[in-house]
Amino acid sequence: MENIQNAVIGEKEISKATEILRKYKQGKLNLEQKIISNEEFFKLRQWDHMTGGESDPKPASAWLFNCIISKHSDAMDSFPEANMLPRAEDDKAEAEMLSSVLPVVLEQNDFETTYSDVAYYTLKNGGGVYGVFWDGSKHNGLGDISIKKIDFINLFWESGITDIQRSTHLFNTEFVSNELLEQQYPELKGKLGQSTITLAKYLYDDTVDISNKSLVIDWYYHKMVNGVKVLHYCKYVNNTVLFATENEPEKYPNGWYDHAQYPFVVQRLFPVEGSICGYGYIDIARDTQEMIDHLNSSILKNAMVNARPRYMVKNGAAINEEEYADLTKDFIHVEANSVNDDSIRAVETTGLPSIYVSVRDGLINEMKECTGNRDVANGGTTSGVTAASAIATMMEQSGKISRDSNKAFYVAFRKVVNQCIELIRQFYDIPRQFRITGEMGTQQYVEYSNAGLKPMAQEPIMGQDMGLRLPVFDIEVTAQKASSYTKMAQNELALQFYNLGFFNPQMADQALACLKAMDFAHKNDVMQTIEQNGTLLQQLQQMQQIAIGLAQQYDPAFAQQLILMAQQSGQPLPQQQSGSAEVSGGEHPYVEKAREDAQSVADPDR
């Protein structure tokens, strides 16, 4: 812990920061209440927030739950991957290496699980947060990137903004065991007690005890130093500073992270003004879900009343009511001459008209339409549609809302990758080993450091020093896991190209002209392959001309063999107009041309 007397950040600064934290907490009370209530809806506990009789049935239907898990499956079907594109020719090799190394870093962080958790959180509450940190304890002290899901309840920012990077201060909080804190910071013994800040809590299924835990606060803030924005960081508990970058200026001259951004990335589902968190599917459809459940309750109550007949028994009627109500009794005892139609009578009930069931079904359809969770998106079909291609097309068309949401997720993923690159630039000074996937799926073992990401000297222009250049990359995000429909369409397109002869080197020019007017995934790769095939064909034809010309000059019999081999290889000779040209009755025109070319090569002055 820093020397408190000479520290820039001390108890006074911590008290001011805590007051700012309280102000930020007050500004997001409504958001916290919404998140806690949404979690109860997701757990099918909506009746805890709805009115109803004590004895009334309380069915909790899962239509809203089904919507969320359906949207989540769409998000995971389009799990993203990043491809780094250089902005300068000199950075091409570094971009290719980053494109191979970063997926390994994400995999080591179990990013797919984190992406899934943040997607669920975003779909439920309208927003989610990634935390992108440098964890110096990883790899036995070597350190590495750590990516975590952050809960809005534990994060505090300036109210009224829509970009978290514009917040003056930022606080991330977490309850940590007192025993663990005292082991890590021995100077805290006897100083840990009840925190002055209380956090909103979910309605957990388990009993969560935080009596032996203390609230640890990570405080991030910006300062301008010589006209440059610098990110500073302070960790404290109660009024005790555990760490502060401003207290160690020699070690942290550029602040906590060189990129000077808050290490948090926020994504929104349906944006709303004045908040970094938007609206989720529970916010949109919870009222409809409540009405569906109320109608279900009334329908079930009516069904139960009609399914179990009740009787009115006149006072004084000599009927054994217990035997009458017990269906296992074959005999019911009554007084002689005491039973008639007036003694006992069934209570007449009225069945529920079908209009109410239709209203309930209409509400269900309303929810499906408003959330874009139609039956066809989950594999269902409308009557009369049986063709597989038609079903696949309908499923693809019904997923446009999910594709729009995935685009928002990709924007956040791009920011996460960008922060990862900046952390690699700052901390990967020591080379480390990676197993990457090379061309054709082969495994390669490479050594990588940040040497190619550091500022580089530029070549002088007319003797003028141009200073340093920082390698910068554009990040292209694509779906790593495409849906079955997308894969099928892509494969069918490739087969169509093959059947149409696009990969035939003789048709390279026509194929390239056609592809320039098309738009599909990996178009540039296909065009590059076709162009290479055409170039190889031209080179092969030139070599054939030279070989046949030389053979005709020194060994005419062998020249004819070369001509036949060229014809049998499936590659037509350039001057041959028909595959049935005669070569025995006279000199083949191709041989004639080959001889002329060979002679011109051997004797340029001829």
What are these regions (language model features)?
Residues 1-52, 122, 130, 139-140, ...:
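C-terminal anchoring/interaction modules
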Residues 104, 158, 264, 529-532:
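Generic detector of bulky aromatic hydrophobic side chains
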Residues 217-222, 228-230, 242-244, 251-254, ...:
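Sequence/fold signature of self-assembling virion shell proteins
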Residues 236, 256-258, 263, 325-326, ...:
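Residue-level "hotspot" positions that anchor or transmit function at local structural transition points
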Residues 1-253, 307, 323, 351, ...:
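Extended, helix-rich architectural segments
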Residues 88-95, 192-196, 253-256, 270-274, ...:
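A broad, low-specificity signal for short, low-complexity segments enriched in glycine/proline
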